[in-house]
Amino acid sequence: MTVFEFEGKLLIVDCGVLFPEEHQPGVNVILPDFSYIRDRLDDVVAVVLTHGHEDHIGAVPYLLKERADIPLVGSRLTLAFIEAKLKEHRITPKTVQVKEGDRRTMGGFDLEFVAVNHSIPDSLAVAIRTAAGMVLHTGDFKMDQFPLDRRITDLGAFARLGAEGVDLFLTDSTNADVPGFTTSEKDLAPAIDAVFRT
């Protein structure tokens, strides 16, 4: 969970859970610390969800128990995941569906959404513009030039935003410290077929 503040308003990007390590028996999930925003929930203009993995959406039900009408902004698939999760908690969310290329203004935050490829479809990065500058938050992403859904990370949009001037770049990519390249998902199909044939 990342909280941005501008002129007294708060924008949250992602609100996920951590999973316990083996030395934490009996712990199911670890929630983010809501103490910074708990007394300022009325200042939260939205929660932007970059994709539907639990470490990015898993704590949303607990946040909405604090204030149920916070708008959730995300792609169609991401919102479908969170709506199903919230149904289990008997919460009906206020949602704003976006796609790559869309722009929305929430409070004093001008949001632009950019396609990124990840191990879950319909993932988005978000450029956040205010009078103070621009933040580019990638969410999780990978560089797969041949994804099964044919939706690649939009490097052209990143270049355009970079030329405009990014003041803060926040990026998150699993195994970014591992040398080499990620195998394309299309290259995994033959291996999966072989397993099922044996």
Over which residues does each language-model region extend?
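His/Asp/Glu-rich metal-coordinating catalytic cores
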Residues: 1-48, 53-198
